Amino acid sequence: MATRSLEKLASIDAQLRALVPGKVSEDDKLVEYDALLLDRFLDILQDLHGEDLKETVQECYELSAEYEGKHDPKKLEELGNVLTSLDPGDSIVIAKAFSHMLNLANLAEEVQIAYRRRQKLKRGDFADENNATTESDIEETFKKLVGDLKKSPQEVFDALKNQTVDLVLTAHPTQSVRRSLLQKHGRIRDCLAQLYAKDITPDDKQELDEALQREIQAAFRTDEIRRTAPTPQDEMRAGMSYFHETIWKGVPKFLRRVDTALKNIGINERLPYNAPLIQFSSWMGGDRDGNPRVTLEVTRDVCLLARMMAANLYYSQIEELMFELSMWRCNDDLRIRAAELYRSSRRDTKHYIEFWKTIPPSEPYRVILGDVRDKLYQTRERTRQMLAHGISDIPEDATYNNVEQFLEPLELCYRSLCECGDRPIADGSLLDFLRQVSTFGLSFVRLDIRQESDRHTDVLDAITQHLEIGSYREWSEERRQEWLLSELSGKRPLFGPDLPRTEEIADVLDTLHVIAELPSDCFGAYIISMATAPSDVLAVELLQRECHVKQPLRVVPLFEKLDDLESASAAVARLFSIEWYRNRINGKQEVMVGYSDSGKDAGRFSAAWQLYKAQEELIKVAKEHGVKLTMFHGRGGTVGRGGGPTHLAILSQPPDTIQGSLRVTVQGEVIEQSFGEEHLCFRTLQRFTAATLEHGMHPPVSPKPEWRALMDEIAVIATEKYRSIVFKEPRFVEYSALATPELEYGRMNIGSRPSKRKPSGGIESLRAIPWIFAWTQTRFHLPVWLGFGAAFKYAIDKDIKNLRMFHEMYNEWPFFRVTIDLVEMVFAKGNPGIAALYDKLLVSEDLLPFGELLRSNYEETRSLLLQIAGHKDLLEGDPYLKQRLRLRDSYITTLNLLQAYTLKRIRDPNYHVTLRPHISKDYMESKSAAELVQLNPTSEYAPGLEDTLILTMKGIAAGLQNTG
């Protein structure tokens, strides 16, 4: 039995209503949604596991809520006593219950956001300040540009036609929720939204409520834990599921809304179907940086699978078009083409469900589309055979080999309809289809290849040594450039089959041979991670030529570390000064900047400022050489890795650094948050498009010289402080490993790549994602804020007038404001008291003073941050976010304690607790606790501990809405 009677416990529903702020607005239904889902879940929990376990859940929640209200350490001690007395089976159920409740809270929030959005649009209210941190609507942006900023509608239209946002989906291991659960969450979200529809009947409501309970129970009964790590092919399939479920239909729907918004500002012309407004790329199966599981076979399979999926989607829609375009009037060009196709038709197509007999010439559009269908069928089947067997008996000329071939008959149909007075029909499903073909092509998404610069150096070093001309690795940068350019200007082959090859060298060359073998439209960019110099780019250009890549991929240097960002503009300027290279790029260059590793290298403050300056300098260099530069932003989901609200991130970039062309990564859990549902997909496309347009037509202010000088000065202080602790403090590596679940991260099986670039090594070799993940789990968020406090304190102590300047910067400079606001949000999610508990349980006694020093630094930074922003309390300007975070805190606290005590039991074999009798009715005394580890038979720990730990990690990640 629970230690306190049920009568003394407040229900979670009542606790929620007592805890959260008053109704934020008339559109606020969050608590109502949240309470409904929790009521249903608690009923299910009682049915499945009994009243005693439900009481224990409520008791844990109450103690957490009391702690969050008063921050009384005694409440943590009481909660710890409850949690440590649970037997392994009950621990798993409690962890799973709280993790599930946090997922339900997320779903309630998503439905609330969609509801508020609809209410806002109904009112025509585009100036809701409470939405400022999260919303950016395309129609709102058009009206702002034309009405407030006096841009002409034609200027807006022209800018939009030439704008491109390329969203690059990556398999970064930050999505901790299994696909099986994501699908169930989607159905829960749908049921909840429909339950609150105004026109719902009593019978509908009853059936929806039953469906809601069914899906909640199904999600709870599904194993949350991935029992094996996903392969790169698994990651690609998971990523492609978003295209199939939401993006495929979302793109034409969004572009139709753009047409409507244009019409509302006086443009009576549709956006051209081939305007590259939204593009999609992927790293899934192409990102080799530190991931040995991405092989040439993986890259080949991923490309072919994507092509097969694209052909299948086109094929599934072509018959709908054939039904729609039944008219007989057409222009002469189409009539002639249809007659030719009709005469050459030799057989009935009995493998089709519809239109399986020869289509008569009196239906010319159907004749044309029937031929398109035939080629799509053959394209799909040939790709399927290539994927399965490596060869196909279907001739290549019976299929579509490039997107121009595919578009031509569709364009012919479109022109004919327009010329015959049927433009409204042309602008229906056919226009949507044309836009899909233009956006997705035959490859569905273009695959980027990413590889470390050192791996290319290894290959070239092997070549030069084999040629007996020295060691490329030991050459100076000038010598490397001289040799590379000499070879690029010549024609001799550099190596043959006798080149000695290590496994790593073979991987680089085999990858390039796969690129040469597959259709060129499968690929996008070749990204060089850890790029430092011009030779890194020239090396890839030479290797592409040597491996016979007929249409070379554009080569994109990725500058990540602080020093590399500082020298990026000089490296690019040198490239632009090389005549061979200028001729190669044809006036266009792409440069990627990395937010994750720069933050791990120098801290968030200095990294953010250096990223800002690097972009300014790169754009300046590009303008001087007449090159159109596209910035590729490698942003993660967390603030520590460059994350934050999309449109604010874009609008705070330096002036002229976007210019209508933007690439950005969409990583891990951010993919689900951006594309998990149709309305989320629509909102994501709106935000990126609107913010990119606004940045180009109404650039943010440039920082004043005195602001720059102050930022330069304090960035040095921030970097010194950060590095003095993370890299120079001898106690830090040991403390970090003990005070966080850093070492246990890999057990979550949420990605195919290792958590370290090298098996040994300290913080330097640890990847940015587990680095951020570990500190996020303990709610201390050290990588985000460390260095801020020292920088601000230095400036204010030096001259109190600097505080006034900080206020000015916060109020007038979008970059500075966004930087401060995001860190303020992280502090609102933080809890140093919880971090202190991890220290108390897990850290050796000699390291405890170090932890206290860091927490003192945390409090000082928090206080200084509020001074800079001119705020009394955290998030005082964002009541919606404040409400959402407070709703989650009590769930997360329970999981934090359960995680900390579980880590204690895992790491300290001498730590013993007194367990009370089993309380869940699912496992009776006649069943041994050993059954609990049937799902995890290989665990090296006592029964239930590893699963409990992983469930707490997933739950905390869900509650904080990010992992790494």
Curated annotation (Swiss-Prot):
Keywords attached to this entry: Allosteric enzyme, Carbon dioxide fixation, Cytoplasm, Lyase, Magnesium, Phosphoprotein, Photosynthesis
The keyword Coiled coil is annotated on this UniProt entry: no
Residues where Phosphoserine is found: S11
EC class (word): lyase
UniProt record, GO biological process: carbon fixation; leaf development; photosynthesis; tricarboxylic acid cycle
Biological role stated in the UniProt entry: Through the carboxylation of phosphoenolpyruvate (PEP) it forms oxaloacetate, a four-carbon dicarboxylic acid source for the tricarboxylic acid cycle.
UniProt name for this protein: Phosphoenolpyruvate carboxylase
Organism (species): Nicotiana tabacum (Common tobacco)
Gene for this chain: PPC
